[in-house]
Structure formats: structure tokens, C-alpha cells
UniProtKB/Swiss-Prot annotation:
Start-end of Basic and acidic residues biased regions: 71-80
Cystine connections: none
Protein name per its UniProtKB record: Fibroblast growth factor 8
Region Disordered, residue ranges: 29-87
GO aspect biological process, one term: positive regulation of cell division
Post-translational modification: The N-terminus is blocked.
GN (gene name): Fgf8
Amino acid sequence: MGSPRSALSCLLLHLLVLCLQAQVRSAAQKRGPGAGNPADTLGQGHEDRPFGQRSRAGKNFTNPAPNYPEEGSKEQRDSVLPKVTQRHVREQSLVTDQLSRRLIRTYQLYSRTSGKHVQVLANKRINAMAEDGDPFAKLIVETDTFGSRVRVRGAETGLYICMNKKGKLIAKSNGKGKDCVFTEIVLENNYTALQNAKYEGWYMAFTRKGRPRKGSKTRQHQREVHFMKRLPRGHHTTEQSLRFEFLNYPPFTRSLRGSQRTWAPEPR
């Protein structure tokens, strides 16, 4: 038999081993049932790890999370929305609007160079030699879409003003083509320029003698492309035809006390 001192040391060593085992078990329970040896988890795949997490070696995983703006970044969302809206408006303004109601206006186009008005004749000729109030100078302007794009036709002949591939102004009975669509551009001098929608950079223009000029030789700053909208002689809009109605109310006077206001009868 050993000495009592050796037996006591063996007992203490046995108690220490039991305490260590209890600590290991409690740690394993806290990690959960799927947690095992840390050395075993290093060899497992990365499918259970969250996106964007880095490994111990410092390398990214195969499928990182996309870089979406945070929910709280209001400035980023506000900067993206106007760009999307502008792109949508620009794309839709280039397409004929088949759903909205057409806005039809009637007026004359006064040429800055010739000093007269644009007219569409029955022989399909177009010039700027009409006087004010001429029936062939009365034009009907139809909206094509919301991007200031219009179709212009003569009210007397029903022919549309179009432009061919050579830049020459021609008259057509069917104005559904893009060559019969013009974009209204309001200039700084308050004149209006009409740019063809099919041939960008080509404008409706007339010389001093009222003859049409080729669109390929026109620029926006030239006087030949400047027009002014004028109502036909004797033509009034709905707003101008309306008259104000004045109602005769009795005059406003004070009573004798001065604290209350009364209506005095109107003198006859």
C-alpha cells in the first residue's frame, strides 16, 4: 500500500479531470448540436456561411452578396430615380402616343424672313407667301406626343407638311409617317423653330421670297427657320370669346353705431 499522501494526490488529480470534462461538455452544449471539433469545421464547405464573409485565409467566397444600396441611403435612391424618369420620358417622347387625346390647335405661321405666312396649296406646293387671313394659310396643328411633337396640315386642303430625304418640304394626304412630325422648339428670341423628327437637325425654313429651303442647309440660329404663331384674322379662342359678368351688389355702408356693418339699398 502507498502512503496516505500519494492517495490524496491521486484523488485530487481525479477530481481535476472530472471538472475539465464537465467544462468541455457545457461548452459543447452552448455551441449547439451541429458544432463539433473546431478542426473539423475548417474542412466544411462555405454554403452555410453568410454572403460577404471572409475566410481565415483572407479570400472572398465564390458568391459574394451584390452591392445594393442600403435601405437608409435616401440620397442614393433620390439620385437614381430622376435618371430613370428622364430616360423613360425621353424614350416615350420619341414614340407616337396612340392612347392620349389629341390636342388640336388652329393658327398661322408667320415667317420671319418673308414677312408673310406659310400656306399649303391644293397643288401640293408649300410656300410662305400668304397674307394674313388667307384661307390656305390657316393651319391645323395636331399633337403627336407630349414631347412638343406636332403634325401640321392645311385646314383648306387637308394636306400634311412633310420632309423627304433630300430635305425638301412636300405635302402628303397621309401624315402618319415620322417625316411628317415636327418638334416645336421655342427659341430665346420667342420665335419657334420646327425641327423634323425623322431627320434631326433639319428645320422647316423659307427664303425671303417665301420659297422653301432644303432642310440640310438649315441651322437653328438662322432667320429662315424662325416662325411666330398668329391667330387667323377674325378668329378668337374660347378664352377670348368669354366675357366677364359684373354683378350689382348694394353699396357697403356703416350703421349709426359704427360697430355693425349694414347693406344700404342701391339708389335708383
